[in-house]
Amino acid sequence: YGDSVFNSKQKYQIKGFQNFYQKKLKNYFNTVHFLPFYPSSSDSGFAVKDHYKIDSRIGKWSNISNFAKKNDVMADIVINHSSARGLWFRNFLREKKPGKNYFLTVNSKFNASKVVRPRDHELLKKINIFKKTEYLWRTFSPDQLDLNFKNPAVLLRFIKIMINLVNHGVTIFRLDAIAYLWKESGTKCINLKQTHEIIKLFRLICSFLNVK
């Protein structure tokens, strides 16, 4: 994590790690995986509120870019879900962009009896929206709302997020919780073929951008 090692005298927590890396680790490692450094509402950074910003406590984009000039940097793309307290969800409720149709809702006919997931909270949250009753999908927590990849705009948004990270020096990516990306009624909703097609697309984009 960007704030795992820091010096309280420094303004940005990530600088403390970078100093520690230079003194203790650089002769042994040339790749660093920074877990989510975005503004987040829960789950140690995995409930992202804004994919285009860095948590102001952790640092700035320039901290990542400068570190990446001499080291390989790996970052997470938190692709399956987004924060219930972020701009996207606020816009979703208002039918405004960015956020309109970004989150997955299902109706009462959806068969979720076979769903496999690593949590035991209530999966679906009833919501009255757009003059009808729908159910928000929440694989990991009530604060982490699953995104709707049946909306091409969501996929395009994450391609842009990847490109933004590349522009700041990131060369290796981890697609967080990617196995849960696609949902179909009556299935386990994990590792579905549609998910693998999206992974192939990201692999193709990585090859084009010369990143991993």
Annotate the PLM regions.
Residues 1-159, 167, 178-212:
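Acidic/aromatic-lined carbohydrate-recognition and catalytic surfaces
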